[in-house]
Amino acid sequence: MMTEAERASKLAEPAANDTPTRGKGVFYVHTLGCQMNVHDSERIAGVLEADGYVPATEEQYLNHDIDLIVMNTCAVRENAAERMYGTIGLWAELKRERPNLQIAVGGCMAQLDREKIAKKAPWVDAVFGTKNIGSLPQLLDQARIEGHAQVKVQEELNYFPSQLPTDRASKVSSWVAISVGCNNTCTFCIVPTTRGKEHDRRPGDILAEIRQCVDEGAKEVTLLGQNVNSFGYGIGDRFAFSKLLRACGEIDGLERVRFTSPHPAAFTDDVIAAMAETPNVMHQLHFPLQSGSDRILRAMRRSYRSAKFLDILRKIREAMPDAQISTDIIVGFPGETEEDFQETLRVVEEARFASAFTFIYSPRPGTPAAEMEQVPHDVVQDRFERLVALQERITEENLKTFEGRDVEVMVTGASGKKDAATHRVTGREKTGVLVHVGVPEGEPMPQVGDFVTATVTHAGRHNLIADPNPEAGQTYAVRH
């Protein structure tokens, strides 16, 4: 399955009638990392198109018929940096074949390594940060004129990226940033360094963008922030996020609202109530645990403990019994003992997460945890495999509970490997579970953005299959 970042890597739809114009140049955006990076790549594409560039078609990309490649980088994990330099190295050969090709590097690694990137990869033409996406066209022009790399990375946020033009990867499902940056000081995390302190957008601006998305065809929005539920704290309104969720419920045509990611320390009862009482806010939650050990949580500077975390989950499930909750867990944080790890396994077993993004701890230079005593790799690997096995079992057991139930799926495409051959469409049901829906014989294929209600006939390891047989009393219905 593709990651959100891979789906965001920008390719244009092929022209229907004639050869597409090259404009100022044909570009491709290669995205690494989180949902915020995915959204930033939409801004990068929008800025370039506003300056006269044209997104590459798949054929142009495969034939290397490209004038500009932009890499939007991630800095959260060590292998992200390795992937960045490895990929840029491959592009050096492409540039030797096409001397006029320009290469730009942006995102979190650019914010961190700015000068190092230009020195280590002198074939790069422009380096820009997370706070000055809008300057990319000017940097490319200067590099073309001056014949050497242009490096411009700002430390201060002068404007919200949301003010920039946007070329959204999906016309029916949109990302909407409500804040940028983070005020927490987790000892393992580099994000406050790359994204800066938290800055919130005005609620009116957020709602105006959501309405614009709906007017342009979006049926679903995901509210983005490093810590969405601390939205409004800077102006002393700790209820601002729950108010925003309720305001989303008043927008005509907006079918589904999701958000990511909240911080457990700031997850309050008013947010739970808003989720439960606002019909178009989905009962899906990504809720990062990081560790089940209170000792490790303290070392991480995570300002909650496992008992509080589990108590919040209890309240969520009391208010929304159908809620699907995913999480992040770090294995092998410095100083983690077997006893600490057993606490994590205990919490995971009790929490019954729908899914978990599990990571082996990766030291990031400049973070306090990188200076702590590290756990031997073989020990960490063993723990990681045990955690994955536990979560895989829980995920399968959870998905089995969907068998025989009717789910409403918003069609996003035919992204499953076998969808075309099996006459299926793909999308997510209300709580975020991926579903492949079989279209009964004689029925027209639903289109992207349609809502299909179907009976789940089989639970896979990570998704659901709905191959309903209406003659046997199973449900299949399409809503446009």
Swiss-Prot record:
Pfam families: Radical_SAM (PF04055), UPF0004 (PF00919). Residues 400-470 form the TRAM domain. [4Fe-4S] cluster 2 binds at C182, C186, C189. Its main location: cytoplasm. It is found in: Cytoplasm. It catalyses: N(6)-dimethylallyladenosine(37) in tRNA + (sulfur carrier)-SH + AH2 + 2 S-adenosyl-L-methionine = 2-methylsulfanyl-N(6)-dimethylallyladenosine(37) in tRNA + (sulfur carrier)-H + 5'-deoxyadenosine + L-methionine + A + S-adenosyl-L-homocysteine + 2 H(+). Residues 25-145 form the MTTase N-terminal domain. The keyword Nucleus does not apply. Keywords: 4Fe-4S, Cytoplasm, Iron, Iron-sulfur, Metal-binding, S-adenosyl-L-methionine, Transferase, tRNA processing. It comes from the Bacteria. SUPFAM superfamilies: Radical SAM enzymes. Residues 168-397 form the Radical SAM core domain. Binds 2 [4Fe-4S] clusters. One cluster is coordinated with 3 cysteines and an exchangeable S-adenosyl-L-methionine. GO terms for molecular function: 4 iron, 4 sulfur cluster binding; metal ion binding; N6-isopentenyladenosine methylthiotransferase activity. Its EC number is 2.8.4.3. Its cofactor is [4Fe-4S] cluster. [4Fe-4S] cluster 1 binds at C34, C74, C108. SMART domains: Elp3. InterPro entries: Elp3/MiaA/NifB-like_rSAM, Methylthiotransferase, Methylthiotransferase_CS, Methylthiotransferase_N, Methylthiotransferase_N_sf, MiaB_methiolase, rSAM, rSAM_horseshoe. Signal peptide: none annotated. One of its GO terms (cellular component) is cytosol. Belongs to the methylthiotransferase family. MiaB subfamily. Monomer. Catalyzes the methylthiolation of N6-(dimethylallyl)adenosine (i(6)A), leading to the formation of 2-methylthio-N6-(dimethylallyl)adenosine (ms(2)i(6)A) at position 37 in tRNAs that read codons beginning with uridine. This is tRNA-2-methylthio-N(6)-dimethylallyladenosine synthase. It comes from Bifidobacterium adolescentis (strain ATCC 15703 / DSM 20083 / NCTC 11814 / E194a).
